[in-house]
Amino acid sequence: MTRILLLLLRFYQYFISPLLGNNCRFHPTCSEYAKEAISMHGSIKGLWFTFKRIIKCQPFCDGGYDTVPISIKNSKPLNKKI
């Protein structure tokens, strides 16, 4: 499922997005955010993060820099005991 979603996003980025122009208020763009979210968190949780991001992408939001939340499972401890 994850691989299919990433292929669909790549298709969108190469063939549809150039026709629509640069309209995203955020950095990274919503499609890049979706690719990162799905790659990091899997298809279901990644789609949930993407849905929340697209809902925020509207005229009353200032936009700005918005990154995918880091998974606690994938993060490394900051203070390693030697």
UniProtKB/Swiss-Prot annotation:
Keyword Membrane: yes
Superkingdom of this protein's organism: Bacteria
Keywords (A to Z) from UniProt: Cell inner membrane, Cell membrane, Membrane
Entry keyword annotation includes Lipoprotein: no
InterPro entries recorded: Membr_insert_effic_factor_YidD
GO cellular component: plasma membrane
Coiled coil: none
Membrane-spanning intervals of the chain: none
Location of the protein in the cell: Cell inner membrane
Record membrane topology: Peripheral membrane protein
Role played: Could be involved in insertion of integral membrane proteins into the membrane.
NCBIfam families: membrane protein insertion efficiency factor YidD
Family: Belongs to the UPF0161 family.
Protein name as annotated: Putative membrane protein insertion efficiency factor
Organism listed in the record: Rickettsia rickettsii (strain Iowa)
